[in-house]
Amino acid sequence: MGWNSWAAYANKINDHRYLGSAAFMRDTLVPQGFGNRKVIYINLDAFWSNLDAVQLSDAVATIKAMRGADGTRFEPGIYWTPFAYWSDNLDAYVEGTNMKYRYRDILLKAPDGSLIPKVDGGWAIDPSHPGAKARTTYYLQQFQKLGFQYLKIDFLSHGSLEGVHFDPAVQTGIEAYNLGMKQIVDETGGRMFLSLSIAPLFPSGYGHARRLSCDTKGHISGGDQSTEYMLNSLTYGWWTSKNLYITDPDHVVLGDKADLGARSVVEGKSRLLSAIISGGMILDSSRLADDSQAQELAQGVYGNRSWLSVAAEDKTFRPIEGDTGDRATDAFVRPSAHGVYVALFNYDEKHPQAITIPFDRIDKTLVSDPSISVVDVATGATLQQGHTDFSVKLSPSESTLLELRWK
């Protein structure tokens, strides 16, 4: 659990906002129960270069010195794109190469020697080029020297693009990707938590976590970057959790001033619950340093210890129904100590929705049984139920976490 700068501040991040967000987590959210195993990651995303060398070093030292009242420690995280270059200054010298190579040298080439066109605005770097390898060594050494414990590596698919590679033994994009990722794993040596983003699903084994979908913010619906968008990925990708990676559901975004932040506690709780059921990896990305609305929403959204306790179990839910096309299912389930947890979502921003779940869709062995109780995890209240099913009415954008108990 922790905080990420991207949706909150993007290219406006600075050391005051970075440290201020960490301080709010320490002083306000941690006492409410936010955190997992008494560790909070405070992560810089893109545009961390807004901080000069002294500011970056001082900020990292400050984060590492932070302690919550309960002993929770704080660890810094950072962001990097090892296989993508974002500038059009192709004559710039490559870091770590002692001016031996310029960026145009290390970019992936077409058979005629021209550069492979940009993808998503970035040039593809050839992982097999010695200049690219030196660049990787340079950045990883700098990150580890500063004391970063968490590394989000983004746009990794750039390293798997097809082209003519510097090393003639590398004949495919995936061979190049394997080469580049192996270097990262070898040179971090288990000393950093590696979270992969925009990365091939296979080959796996090169990171601890992998983004389940792409960027996700705080709105319940509306297409890309919504809670439903991310849960569509969980609907069809739940099986990757712990089999390939820890599933990363991206950040929880609260408040109007952040990018597509949740506009209410109800909507924010739905985004939080979507992260909880995706394995419990929760990174807030709200303007906690300087936005009173985001601070108020955060206290309301992260204020239920029972929900956070479920998140701390680090287990992923499965969809009850799996034939939903390009939409997410609205009901997810996983075993609990007393039966099963069930998470339900209303993706409609304007209308309430009643959801009815037959017991035998959850477990074929469940039949009409008066000993089954349906409990709201957040409040502990017991809900009424039918003989063969239970129904819940959700307000617009609302979600709920229930436990069916029979053990």
Where do the model's predicted regions map?
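Structural recognition of the beta-strand scaffold that forms the well-ordered cores
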Residues: 1-5, 40-44, 75-80, 150-154, ...
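The substrate-binding groove and active-site-proximal loops of carbohydrate-active enzymes
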Residues: 2-16, 44-54, 118-134, 157-174
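Catalytic domains of carbohydrate-active enzymes, especially glycoside hydrolases
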Residues: 17-47, 143-147
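An active-site-proximal structural segment forming one wall of the substrate-binding cleft
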Residues: 26-33, 125-153
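Substrate-binding/active-site clefts of carbohydrate-active enzymes
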Residues: 52-56, 71-137
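Glycan-recognition surfaces
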Residues: 101-130, 134, 185-291
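Carbohydrate-binding surface patches
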Residues: 269-271, 275-278, 283, 321-366, ...
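C-terminal beta-strand-rich structural cap/linker in extracellular carbohydrate-active enzymes
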Residues: 386-407
